[in-house]
Regions:
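A structural preference for long, well-packed, hydrophobic secondary-structure segments
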Residues: 1-7, 38, 46-52, 56, ...
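Short, well-ordered coil/turn segments that N-cap beta-strands
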Residues: 2-6, 53-56, 84-88, 108-109, ...
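Conserved anion-binding
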Residues: 9-34, 98-162
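Short C-terminal domain-edge/linker segments immediately following a structured domain
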Residues: 36-43, 88-90, 157-162
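Amphipathic coiled-coil/heptad-repeat helices and related helical stalk/stem segments
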Residues: 41, 72, 96, 144-145
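Active-site phosphate/pyrophosphate- and oxyanion-stabilizing loops and adjacent acidic/basic residues
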Residues: 46, 77, 150
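N-terminal active-site wall of soluble small-molecule enzyme domains
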Residues: 50-51, 55-106
Length: 162
């Protein structure tokens, strides 16, 4: 049987943790939670992991995903310092080798490669275990190159089904 894990998630927008609302990213507002005061990423990350301990935290950088910005490295660095020993999976809309290499060079975690951001399967095959693959879909529609969904030979060990 394959391993299955529940991984806590933070969505970042404009330097704050935001609350998801049915996928309507434009209307996400800073989170209000009984876990911690405010919406500062490192504070929320530490509180979330105290409530749901685990070895991994998924961070979606919505500014990078939606606006094409570079990942918010200062926020990721603060999260990493606040949560020692926790591996970060970072979704920043990575779609090209240069952006991925720059992120990998930062040493801040493993990039999450979303199938919806890819034009072909070569980047996934090239990165192998360095990344996490997210197989994205909308309803029954598979997003991104069909080969990413159909050919598991190039998948890393860690795959997310969205």
């Amino acid at each position: 049987m394959e391993a299955f894990a529940v991984i806590p998630v933070l969505d970042l927008r404009h330097g704050r943790v935001v609350r998801a609302r049915a996928g309507q990213r434009q209307s996400y507002a800073p989170i209000e939670t009984p876990l911690a005061k405010g919406s500062e990423p490192a504070t929320i990350a530490r509180a979330l992991l105290a409530a749901c301990p685990g070895p991994t935290l998924y961070v979606a950088d919505l500014d990078a995903i939606m606006d094409g910005r570079a990942p918010d490295l200062p926020a990721l660095e603060r999260i990493a310092r606040a949560c020692p020993g926790v591996g970060l999976w970072v979704d920043a809309g990575f779609s090209d080798a240069a952006g991925l290499e720059a992120f990998l060079d930062s040493g801040l975690g493993r990039p999450v490669i979303g199938s919806e951001s890819q034009r072909d399967a070569r980047l996934v095959a090239r990165l192998g275990q360095q990344m996490v693959l997210s197989l994205d879909s909308r309803g029954s529609e598979r997003l991104g190159p069909a080969a990413l969904h159909a050919d598991a030979r190039h998948w890393p060990d860690d795959v997310i089904a969205m």
